[in-house]
């Protein structure tokens, strides 16, 4: 994770476009200025950033299903639950699944775990639109390469 640049996902482990699921890894950094205030003596990953990591995981899934033709933007968070603390240095595994898609919106369910322990979950709604600027598409293509997005999956 690179918290300062909001890159929450380090690597895509599995993308199944038929099942509409994704599994990713996100390594929580050992050191970050975020932990200086959250919380001194007991650093934990902020729930809002855990939610963002689940949203980014869902976003990569949606990009794949839509073959990088439309860009998803987070529109609503429902049923977000923080079930345990996530500490610096821990490895998150995040899974997301598309529950519904249509009329320019998509709903996903996402869960983040450390090992087998569920740490958080949420239902997320996205609005997706054609890429509003070519520079954003170029950026997303570069990020896809960086995190190991299987581009061959969208060329079938």
Language model segments and positions:
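Catalytic strand-loop segment that frames the active site of acyl-thioester-processing enzymes
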Residues: 4-45
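HotDog/MaoC-like acyl-thioester-processing domains
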Residues: 21, 88, 99-156
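Compact, glycine-rich, soluble single-domain proteins
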Residues: 39-46, 50-60, 74
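Hydrophobic beta-strand-centered segment that forms part of the acyl-chain substrate-binding groove
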Residues: 57-93, 119-121, 127-129
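Short aromatic-glycine motifs in intrinsically disordered, low-complexity regions
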Residues: 1-3, 67
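Conserved positions in beta-strands of structured domains
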Residues: 10-13, 78, 83, 97-99
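Short, hydrophobic/aromatic-enriched beta-strand segments in well-ordered soluble domains
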Residues: 26, 95-98
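Hydrophobic core residues within well-ordered beta-strands of beta-rich domains
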Residues: 6-8, 92, 106
């Amino acid at each position: 994770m690179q918290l300062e640049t909001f890159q929450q996902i380090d690597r895509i482990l599995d993308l199944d476009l038929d099942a509409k699921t994704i599994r990713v890894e996100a390594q929580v950094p050992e050191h970050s200025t975020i932990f200086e205030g959250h919380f001194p003596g007991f650093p934990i990953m902020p729930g809002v950033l855990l939610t963002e990591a689940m949203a980014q995981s869902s976003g990569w899934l949606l990009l794949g299903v839509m073959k990088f033709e439309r860009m998803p933007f987070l529109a609503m968070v429902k049923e977000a639950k923080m079930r345990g603390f996530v500490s610096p240095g821990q490895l998150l595994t995040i899974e997301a699944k598309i529950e519904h898609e249509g009329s320019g919106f998509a709903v996903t369910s996402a869960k983040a775990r450390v090992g087998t322990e569920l740490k958080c979950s949420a239902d997320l709604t996205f609005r997706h639109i054609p890429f509003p600027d070519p520079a954003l598409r170029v950026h997303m293509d570069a990020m896809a390469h960086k995190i190991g997005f299987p581009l061959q999956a969208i060329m079938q």
